[in-house]
């Protein structure tokens, strides 16, 4: 296990730098490394690491979502509120619907399986979007119109839509009797509950940090542990109505930055450093899940489905921003 982590870290740093030198995204290098050393490649990652791969990827995602929350500003959110709401569901629904129909006609998939495929592909990856948007914010690009904040906010809610619709199709596939209306109603409720829980948790942590004077590193660890507990809680809930834990995580960071700005700025710097390691783990382990033979077998038709999805997502983005100044 220790050797596997060493290979992931050293290889990830090397491939990240190499792809940067080629003017390609560094994350592509890390994904390529994962494919190369994963179980479908050279098989250099131990079974122990692969067994906890899902948990490691979740922790990495939590780290970048906390950092995203620490990068949001209330004034900007108010300014782009309406556009963010439309952008959070229209592009994803259009993309998912287009991919679903295309998969039915091209791959002759049953409707339920096509729907599952569609909303796996349509889900936005915060781990890709968030670092790029934070980089734009730090470099003061798009700040006047709030474009990075708009995308940050929309991407997190987009995921809730995609996951909920995917889980609905998955339930049908498993033969479960699912109330579609209740599932759809759960989307806005889970988002609102996620925000509420995030605000309450953020305020509670602020009060705790103000009373217990500890090093910022310990505050980061406590914040990370609380965020992990929230995601575990959501996964284990069996109630009809749930909450969006990833939005809660993001909201905690936002609340700390708004209510305790000095601490928020210090924590943001800490999470930037933590993300360097988390990013390596996340993208290399994602790459390790890729069966390159299956991907190659999809060939041109697989590429066509993705292309059609992106075209309809672009149409959704355009519709969402009609009437705005963007």
Task: Give residue ranges: language-model regions.
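Transmembrane helical cores of multi-pass secondary ion antiporters/exchangers
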Residues: 1-326
């Amino acid at each position: 296990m220790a050797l596997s982590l060493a290979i992931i870290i050293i290889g990830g740093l090397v491939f990240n730098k190499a792809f940067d030198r080629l003017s390609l995204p560094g994350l592509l290098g890390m994904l390529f490394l994962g494919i190369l050393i994963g179980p479908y490649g050279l098989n250099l990652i131990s079974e122990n690491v692969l067994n906890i791969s899902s948990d490691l990827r979740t922790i990495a995602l939590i780290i970048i979502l906390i950092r995203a929350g620490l990068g949001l500003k209330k004034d900007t959110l108010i300014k782009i509120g309406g556009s963010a709401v439309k952008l959070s569901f229209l592009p994803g629904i259009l993309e998912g619907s287009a991919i679903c129909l295309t998969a039915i006609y091209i791959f002759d998939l049953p409707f339920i399986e096509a729907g599952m495929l569609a909303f796996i592909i349509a889900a936005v990856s915060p781990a890709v979007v968030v670092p790029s948007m934070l980089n734009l914010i730090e470099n003061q690009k798009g700040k006047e119109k709030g474009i990075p904040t708009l995308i940050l906010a929309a991407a997190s809610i987009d995921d809730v839509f995609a996951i909920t619709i995917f889980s609905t199709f998955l339930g049908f596939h498993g033969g479960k009797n699912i109330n579609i209306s209740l599932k759809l109603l759960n989307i806005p409720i889970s988002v609102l509950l996620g925000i509420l829980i995030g605000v309450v948790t953020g305020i509670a942590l602020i009060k705790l940090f103000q009373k217990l004077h500890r090093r910022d590193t310990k505050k980061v660890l406590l914040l990370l542990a609380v965020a992990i507990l929230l995601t575990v809680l959501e996964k284990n809930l069996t109630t009809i109505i749930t909450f969006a834990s990833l939005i809660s995580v993001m909201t905690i960071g936002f609340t700390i930055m708004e209510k305790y700005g000095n601490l928020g700025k210090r924590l943001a710097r800490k999470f930037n450093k933590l993300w360097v390691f988390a990013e390596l783990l996340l993208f290399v382990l994602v790459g390790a899940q890729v069966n390159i033979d299956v991907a190659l077998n999809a060939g041109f038709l697989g590429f066509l489905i993705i292309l059609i999805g992106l075209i309809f997502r672009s149409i959704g983005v355009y519709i969402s921003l009609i009437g705005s100044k963007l």
